[in-house]
Every structure is written in structure tokens, then in C-alpha cells.
């Protein structure tokens, strides 16, 4: 698969970003220094339903879905200033994004471009460097759930393909340099980034 250097056309998100607050959240105990990228277990709608179900005991700050149209969908489930339950002992230290399953298979890159823009936005607002950290216990940056190892629950998402991950990180840096996604992202406590 040949990965594009940039989106074929600008990524446009709905205005405003969709919000559906998950009960699966709690107070943060520290300032986040990581962005952790995940791959949901299922498709967009059912994944949102599951992450908003108290029985799941899991959540994320944002979940994205690509539709291959250039207009992609993102829903925020947990306010930025709260802890999402997504990666075990790293929950307080991180912002967590679930990126549509098809993005990591190369079937629909829209969700990956949207997630890159979100990561660029978070990096701009928080000072987290737009760089892949493979030492998430000690270095700030962006990491895969997989990179957290056993301390993050022992997962292999969103991808173990280093070539694809490096491509994704180039998109994050590109969005960071453009200023990230800013004005239309949320109101009230959803807009505040801890």
C-alpha cells in the first residue's frame, strides 16, 4: 500500500464536534504528558455505545471515524480535564484517542487524518511534543497503546506496523505545524485542556 503524503483534500470536521459524555471517567491525578492512540474493538457507533456503557469500565477522550469522503466524524466522550479509562496505569498521564478500525488497515485513511489533526491540536494546546515516544514511562509525546506494554494493559493496538505509524506521526507533525484544529472544538469544559 502506498500512503499519501497529505490528505487528498482538506479534512473537514462537523461543526461543532459531537459530544456524548461517557460515565466512565474520573478525576485526573496529574498533568497529562502523553497522547495515546488506540484502535476500537468495533465500528464507530457500537464502539461509542460500549464506551458510554458503565459495564464497559472503559472510555476515551475522542473516537474518530473516516468515511472516505473528506468529511470525517469525531465524537468526544470525556472532557479534556478528566481522566478517560483507556490504558490502565497511564490513564491520568494521557489523552486517549480511538481511531477507526479501517484507518489502520489502509482501507479508509480519513480517520487517520482526522486523528492527526486532533493530535496536532492537543500538542499545540498542551506543549506535549508532536513526536513518537517509545519510552512513555519517562518521555512526553505521542505513543501507541502497544508501546505501553504490560503497564498499559498489554495491547497491540492501534498497529504494530512501524512504517504505517511513522507515516501517521508525519501527519501529526504536519498538522501541528499548521496550528492544529482550533476554533470550533467544543464549548465549556470540553474545550479546556488540562
Report each predicted region and the residues it spans.
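Glycine-rich, often proline-containing surface loops adjacent to acidic residues and nearby aromatics
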Residues: 91-101
Amino acid at each position: 500500500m502506498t500512503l499519501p503524503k497529505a490528505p487528498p483534500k482538506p479534512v473537514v470536521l462537523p461543526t461543532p464536534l459531537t459530544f456524548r459524555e461517557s460515565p466512565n471517567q474520573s478525576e485526573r491525578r496529574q498533568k497529562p504528558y502523553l497522547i495515546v492512540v488506540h484502535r476500537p474493538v468495533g465500528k464507530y457507533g457500537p464502539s461509542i455505545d460500549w464506551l458510554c456503557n458503565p459495564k464497559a469500565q472503559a472510555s476515551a477522550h475522542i473516537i474518530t471515524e473516516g468515511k472516505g469522503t473528506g468529511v470525517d466524524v469525531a465524537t468526544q466522550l470525556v472532557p479534556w480535564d478528566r481522566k478517560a479509562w483507556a490504558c490502565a496505569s497511564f490513564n491520568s498521564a494521557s489523552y486517549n484517542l480511538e481511531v477507526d478500525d479501517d484507518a489502520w488497515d489502509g482501507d479508509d485513511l480519513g480517520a487517520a487524518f482526522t486523528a492527526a489533526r486532533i493530535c496536532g491540536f492537543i500538542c499545540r494546546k498542551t506543549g506535549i511534543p508532536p513526536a513518537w515516544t517509545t519510552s512513555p514511562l519517562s518521555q512526553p509525546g505521542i505513543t501507541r497503546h502497544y508501546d505501553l506494554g504490560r503497564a498499559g494493559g498489554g495491547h497491540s493496538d492501534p498497529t504494530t506496523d512501524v512504517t504505517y505509524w511513522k507515516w501517521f506521526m508525519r501527519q501529526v507533525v504536519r498538522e501541528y505545524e499548521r496550528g492544529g484544529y482550533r476554533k470550533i472544538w467544543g464549548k465549556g469544559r470540553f474545550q479546556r485542556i488540562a
